[in-house]
Amino acid sequence: MDKIEVRGARTHNLKDINLTIPRDKLTVITGLSGSGKSSLAFDTLYAEGQRRYVESLSAYARQFLSLMEKPDVDHIEGLSPAISIEQKSTSHNPRSTVGTITEVYDYLRLLYARVGEPRCPTHHAPLAAQTVSQMVDKVLELPEGSKMMLLAPIVKERKGEHVKTLENLAAQGFIRARIDGETCDLSDPPTLELHKKHTIEVVVDRFKVRPDLQQRLAESFETTLELSGGIAVVAPMDGDGEEIIFSANFACPQCGYSMQELEPRLFSFNNPAGACGTCDGLGVQQYFDPSRVIQDDSLSLAQGAIRGWDQKNYYYFQMLTSLADHYGFDLHAPFNSLPKKTQDVILKGSGRTEIEFKYINDRGDIRVKRHPFEGILNTLERRYRDTESNSVREELAKYISTKSCSSCGGTRLRLEARNVFIADTTLPEIVELSIADALTFFQTLKLEGQRAQIAEKVMKEINDRLQFLVNVGLNYLNLSRSAETLSGGEAQRIRLASQIGAGLVGVMYVLDEPSIGLHQRDNERLLKTLTHLRDLGNTVLVVEHDEDAIRCADHVIDIGPGAGVHGGNVVAEGTMDEIIANPNSLTGQYLSGAKEIAVPKERTPRDPKKTVELLGATGNNLKNVDLSIPVGLFSCITGVSGSGKSTLINDTFFKIAHTQLNGATTAHPSPYKSIKGLEHFDKVIDIDQSPIGRTPRSNPATYTGIFTPIRELFAGTQESRSRGYKPGRFSFNVRGGRCEACQGDGVIKVEMHFLPDVYVPCDVCKGKRYNRETLEVRYKGKTIDEVLEMTVEDARTFFDPVPAIARKLQTLMDVGLSYIRLGQAATTLSGGEAQRVKLARELSKRDTGKTLYILDEPTTGLHFHDIQQLLTVLHRLRDHGNTVVVIEHNLDVIKTADWIIDLGPEGGQGGGEIIAQGTPEDVSQIEGSHTARFLKPMLK
């Protein structure tokens, strides 16, 4: 079977299509945004491949896997088990890092456990084995008369009931054991839970420390070491005080510091054996941040320098008044003029010093109490810890910042794990290197003798995985980077690298725009990776708009001709040449050059007097960057992946502007020296790819504000007025007009064990969300439900006489979203669609001509034709006097910009500098700029 046959696919907007996809080839599916590419690739081919595989498993196994819905298709044959690698950002788990996702960290843990050299954290001496005599001498140094017990660890953090182990110990004549920290009698041991981890230590001896114990202790230690395999624990019998761990294996000869045998879990920050005890392996601690708590240090405490502690809050202000009397400071002096010591008392408390507080109640009675002052930060911390109210917790969370853990310095690991070395390098130092540097380290690492033999296979796995990450253009990341901070494109390429590492054969891979966030320079390496996956013997399906990817494909499928209801057909399929030769294919016309996105005939000139200057930006890898953005122009920020574009624009420039122009209090910009020129703007708007809503109740109509005037129109009809209906009657979010059986969702979720959750249309309202009475009201012959089911295009015609609604609908059409339905659930919109809905909402607002717009890769998910529409919109914003700043890799966007700022020269530590800026023509001449190399041919 050398092909996949699809017959009668009708998923979403697909129009009963038939097609043949060659197996073990690289197939690119392209077409306009919303034409049905994802419906074919993910919701039909992947869903069916996955469903068939999961259905072959037992019912018991199926309950642990999410089953895909059966797609609406007559027949598919030739499918393999499918793996999808989507755009969605990886994980919101703070414990996930690049190292853990790619499994490189698992191999590093194994390597350090097998060939690492433990050292003493104090003396930095390699640990040596302790003799029984040394152990006895150490115990006899304890205070005479101390009651101690000698324990042999038998089971360490292992699941099971351990009945046999306990019976064997009793049979050997042992009387007591310490199980999970509690001492018990072995004649009547507790029943242990099968699925919990347990630690069992047998009590070998109990004694009072005295000098004549030498012989007895030596024998007891020998028994202990034999039982436990070289570890002995001496613990106080009353449970108070330090335990001493002895090891016949590792110990510092100077101070006796010893540690357990090296195991992979000792290096895991997700395991209690390896995680730092202070931050539980997260690497950061939360704290109430004085810079957030103090709203304005130029105000006095009485005026409200600290919110909630001013004169309006009588109870707290009385406390400050008593505090001021005691320490002799002025409540009406600016907070920043108070001595540092006084500020510390106000924020951190008076320690043990008792202060006389006078409290006056509503009736004027005075109560006097003496107690220390807790301090504002400690009060907030206590309230945050003790409250059961979510709203209080959310309010207090605004004042919390995170800082690197004080114990482990952000490495997440406990002391022992941080002091194991390979070639004088610790594991935390390795994961802080960029992936490219880590690869160099392991390629040049030379181990001797037996250690080299042990490490050989593990090193091969580490090198291979690091090489795959470099191949997909992620050489600038480091292994300790938190998964939460990765962009969608980075997350997808990490998963791609993991799949290549798995080395599977005979699988169908379905990828969603893997080139997102990738500079043209790195694109070649990505395409090589995809062809490598294919050459292993896999079928690779890629939804992609990138010209290089389309040219590289063995087979191309062009879905269209339009978007939404106008799409869903196979317009052209075959080789690249066949697509170009097909007159119906819009993609073919752009590839052949018959259609193109033109370079503007003239650039809008820059006014040197009107610029925004950001000086001294040093966040992440930025090297003291000075940024100058021209006001009133369309500027493009370019550079290879990881060069610092997002740090400079999103984390620094946008957050400063957001704070100063929009009055944001929770945006904390990356470090910088100064900024000037923001007076040219009245607001800043960041249009990113995050979802417009996380529930099916959110939709384009509610988000863009069209739904309110639509509900008002319905409430204004004759029928509504006679029934007394207000606009709220037509909302599916509140009681009154909505169907109460499904609470306005239109569907009811039925949980099915062993099968996917089923959403069935509500029996009462038949999926229409509203009750019968509400649906009896019609506007121009349509019910509110029928209006929500309209596409933007149909609604634009329908509401043409209503300017307030028509204008907003027109902007949705302008950004290429004519095909989405007004009531379409936000959860079904792609990242690119969500971004364009946001763009439409901003466009529909009254234009001041003084707005700063920031967009991060707006071409995600866009076909050449969609990009043309998007550029028209962005140029229109610019022509009205606004300033548009776009982070982008797409050369069609870059060549139409007025001004380019190129960061680089490389990613990670090799980047972080502005290497070129000017018009596209200027930048294309700069030597050493990767962007210039690819831009030059586009300007001819």
UniProtKB/Swiss-Prot annotation:
GO CC entries: cytoplasm; excinuclease repair complex
Zn-finger segments (C4-type): 252-279, 739-765
Cellular localisation: Cytoplasm
Coiled coil regions in record: none
Spans traversing the lipid bilayer: none
Positions of the ABC transporter domain: 309-586, 606-936
GO terms, molecular function: ATP binding; ATP hydrolysis activity; DNA binding; excinuclease ABC activity; zinc ion binding
InterPro entries, per the entry: ABC_transporter-like_ATP-bd, ABC_transporter-like_CS, ATP_grasp_subdomain_1, P-loop_NTPase, UvrA, UvrA_DNA-bd, UvrA_inter
Swiss-Prot/TrEMBL GO biological process terms: nucleotide-excision repair; SOS response
UniProt-annotated binding residues for ATP: 31-38, 639-646
Keywords annotated in UniProt: ATP-binding, Cytoplasm, DNA damage, DNA excision, DNA repair, DNA-binding, Excision nuclease, Metal-binding, Nucleotide-binding, Repeat, SOS response, Zinc, Zinc-finger
Pfam (any one): ABC_tran
Function: The UvrABC repair system catalyzes the recognition and processing of DNA lesions. UvrA is an ATPase and a DNA-binding protein. A damage recognition complex composed of 2 UvrA and 2 UvrB subunits scans DNA for abnormalities. When the presence of a lesion has been verified by UvrB, the UvrA molecules dissociate.
Family: Belongs to the ABC transporter superfamily. UvrA family.
Subunit structure: Forms a heterotetramer with UvrB during the search for lesions.
Name assigned to this protein: UvrABC system protein A
Organism, scientific name: Vibrio parahaemolyticus serotype O3:K6 (strain RIMD 2210633)
